[in-house]
UniProtKB/Swiss-Prot annotation:
Biased composition regions of type Basic residues, renumbered to the chain: 381-399
Assembly and oligomerization: Interacts with PFN1. Homodimer and heterodimer with PFN1.
GO cellular component: nucleus
Organism: Homo sapiens
Motif (Nuclear localization signal): 83-86, 382-385, 390-393
Subcellular localization: Nucleus
Comp. bias (Basic and acidic residues): 156-170
Biased composition (Pro residues): 137-149, 219-252, 305-329, 366-377
Protein name: Myb-related transcription factor, partner of profilin
Species lineage: Eukaryota, Metazoa, Chordata, Craniata, Vertebrata
Top-level taxon of the source organism: Eukaryota
Keyword Lipid metabolism applies: no
Compositional bias annotation for Low complexity: 127-136
Record's comment describing the protein's domains: The proline-rich region is required for PFN1 interaction.
Region (Disordered) residue spans: 87-108, 127-261, 297-332, 358-399
Length: 399
């Protein structure tokens, strides 16, 4: 039972890989420094995700060359992100730890952290940097890092100092050929202080050749185009001389302004149109005079040059109004009910109710009304025995 538990514990411990050793950290920092432009620098925007993953896999392959276990590119990238995050957090705590009392040895920076500072550049030296954020490299600056963080970077042990010397001597060539100007090894402890970082090396400025721009002088206004001479007209009859065209205003010398040029062109166009209208008017007058002189010379034409105008035609008479026949008297004929008994007495129709209806005469002359009948003792409405006694419904009216 105990052996089984020991086997499970051993199997469990095998699942976790050992921590990164000092040599692995040095290889990781060196390779990231060499490929920093592709991973986080100016070229990272043009590098695809697959290419960036291949770069991390190459770094992991170099680390696996000195170890017996194998690390993947994701593990190597995570180790670098942890390195960077912890370094930024420690740098953010430095100004606060130096203001109060207490030992500052707990915030001492290691050789790896110093190298990470050199890789990330002076942009991460500001306090309050975000933890774990993937920030692009900051622009090179000539300002020195905070003075409070400078003395504490060198609270290192003797073995760290030796490793630091070996690391700086090994990577001096890599630092000289680094693509970024600020990616070079930091100051050494033998210098006795943190010197100011060297400013960005730039090539000596070439002799600036002054470029003289030619002064543009104002061009004079364009001269007005000469007016074309009017076409010659054959004079058939003498005509009075035409009035001379109005004199043109003298051109005023002013600065070359596009608005003035436009107004001047408009004025010239208006003058040309006015002169053309006068020329056409004169030509029409001469043509009418020539026609009036030629019409009497034609055979079969009266002496008068022009016939008198015809009188306007008289307006048409209004249409006759239709004659309407005289209105006939309206005669309303009311149908008598079936139950009314009528009798003919002396040619007159006498209803049972005592109403006398005069018959129509053939000649159209009305007859005199007959004498009224004597009153009857029997009631006027007498129901015959042959009529049915049922009730009438619908549109029939009862008598």
């Amino acid at each position: 039972m105990a052996s089984a538990a020991a086997g499970e514990a051993e199997e469990t411990t095998r699942l976790r890989k050992p921590r990164f050793s000092f040599e692995e950290n040095q290889i990781l920092i060196r390779e990231v420094r060499a490929h920093y432009p592709q991973l986080y620098g100016a070229q990272s925007r043009r590098v695809s995700v697959a290419e960036r993953r291949r770069v991390w896999d190459g770094i992991a392959a170099k680390i696996n060359g000195i170890t017996s276990w194998k690390r993947t590119g994701q593990e190597v990238q995570k180790r670098w992100n942890d390195f960077k995050r912890r370094t930024k957090e420690k740098l953010a705590r430095v100004p606060h730890s130096t203001q109060g009392a207490g030992p500052a040895a707990e915030d001492a920076f290691s050789a790896e952290e110093e190298t990470i500072f050199a890789i990330l550049g002076p942009g991460v030296a500001a306090p309050g940097a975000g933890a774990g954020a993937e920030e692009p490299p900051a622009a090179p600056s000539s300002q020195p890092p905070p003075p409070s963080a400078c003395p504490q970077r060198y609270v290192l042990s003797e073995d760290r100092r030796e490793d630091r010397r070996a690391d700086t001597s090994a990577h001096s060539k890599a630092g000289s050929s680094s693509p970024e100007p600020w990616a070079r090894p930091s100051c050494t402890p033998q210098e006795g202080g943190c010197p100011r970082p060297k400013e960005r090396e730039s090539p000596p400025p070439s002799a600036l050749q002054p470029v003289q721009l030619p002064r543009l002088a104002l061009s004079p206004p364009p001269p007005a185009p000469p007016l074309p001479p009017p076409p010659p007209l054959a004079q058939v009859a003498p005509s009075p001389p035409s009035p001379p065209p109005p004199p043109r205003p003298p051109p005023t010398l002013s600065a070359s302004d596009p608005s003035l040029d436009f107004l001047r062109a408009q004025q010239e166009t208006a003058n040309a149109i006015r002169e053309l209208a006068g020329t056409l008017r004169q030509g029409l007058a001469k043509l009418s005079e020539a026609l009036s002189a030629l019409l009497p010379l034609l055979p079969g034409t009266p002496v008068d040059s022009l016939p008198p105008p015809l009188p306007p035609p008289p307006p048409p008479p209004p249409p006759p109004r239709p004659v309407l026949p005289p209105p006939a008297p309206k005669v309303e004929i009311t149908p008598e009910p079936v139950s009314v008994v009528a009798a003919v007495v002396d040619g007159a129709v006498v209803a049972a109710r005592g109403v006398i209806i005069a018959p129509r005469s053939e000649e159209g002359a009305p007859r005199p009304p007959p004498a009224p009948l004597p009153p009857h003792d029997s009631p006027p409405h007498k129901r015959r025995k042959g009529f049915p006694t049922r009730k009438r419904r619908g549109r029939w009216k009862s008598p």
